[in-house]
Design a protein with these regions (language model features):
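Noncatalytic, solvent-exposed loop/strand surfaces
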Residues: 1-182
């Protein structure tokens, strides 16, 4: 894309802004002319996936779901992961002590599948962003007290295609990446 990033963030330097009633620390994800964003409200009791038009900033759709509030670190949010995208779907993950919820929506906002991968234990809250690799959604879920796993879900169905148990006793915050041998 042909654009220049401004050195100052002033109103004259951006085309539109989008006031949000909810919050989150994840980054927006862009596919074509659509911007997707995860957000949360009411101390995590509501989780939201939002789609806006990248040209105008107008909200195209919002999908909100009930969730459970829980303790998290004061510098974390209840929506700290970035959505993953492919040409057909937007994928989001949300974690708290009793569940790790992965979901897929089509680009028009219709829910395709949801999958609960168990809880997340850790004093700082959940913050992992999934990635799409080929036809798999990759989600790490290391646990502070051990017993976590890394998952590969089928992008189309949400079925677990593989799971790697992890002995780690540290919570994961990094986004996975795919290594290609030279």
């Amino acid at each position: 894309a042909d654009c220049q990033i401004p050195s100052e963030w002033k109103k004259k330097n951006f085309r539109w802004s989008l006031p949000l009633e909810e919050s989150g620390h994840g980054s927006p994800a862009v596919w074509g002319n659509r911007v997707f964003l995860n957000a949360s409200a009411k101390k995590g009791k509501t989780r939201t996936i939002l789609c806006a038009d990248a040209r105008s900033g107008e909200i195209e759709w919002i999908r909100s779901y009930a969730s459970k509030t829980h303790r998290t670190h004061r510098y974390n949010s209840f929506a700290s992961s970035t959505p993953a995208l492919d040409e057909k779907r937007v994928y989001s993950v949300w974690g708290h002590p009793s569940e790790l919820k992965a979901s897929a929506h089509d680009h028009q906002g219709r829910l395709i599948w949801e999958k609960d991968l168990g809880g997340v234990t850790g004093g700082h809250g959940f913050g992992v962003s999934p990635i799409v690799h080929q036809d798999l959604l990759i989600i790490p879920n290391d646990q502070e007290k051990g017993g976590g796993s890394h998952y590969a879900l089928d992008c189309k169905t949400g079925a677990i295609r593989w799971q790697v148990p992890r002995a780690s006793r540290r919570l994961t915050y990094s986004t996975p990446c795919v290594f290609t041998s030279p």
